[in-house]
Amino acid sequence: MKSNFGQSMAHAGFGIFMLAVVSNAVYSQEKIYDAKVGSKLQLDEYIFDFKNIEQEEKVNFNSIKAYLSLSKSGKDLGEFTPEIRFYSDPPTITSETSIIHQFFSDVYVVMNVPQNQESISLRLHIKPFMNILWLGVVMIILGGIITCLLYTSPSPRD
């Protein structure tokens, strides 16, 4: 086995990575909703059921947390808990994304800063081929490691 194996693996990994990046850019979906508790939101074949919203006070921040369940074709796939955090020192607002990982895609929800008391703005995303993207990255790393381990310096000539 020569060091070419590692190089081939790394290059194949880069090809897989690029294919996943392009496929993700073409096939990803996003939709923004102004939602109220009890709303059922749809993106592609996924149904997002907006269950509840809570305000929490922690030691160093206050937050607004939403609870949504995800289903597809009647099958429950999990629960999202996106969150907006308000830090006082220094004054900062952050958005905590909630993700459900699946084999061929990631589905995630981002909550925007509320503009009124009536509804909350939610961004729903479907990002396909994310695991394939990470497979490409792992192949690049392993290819580099294999190449380094199998590398032999040329012997000096007499």
Identify the function of each model-found stretch.
Residues 1-153, 157:
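Solvent-exposed, non-transmembrane regions of integral membrane proteins
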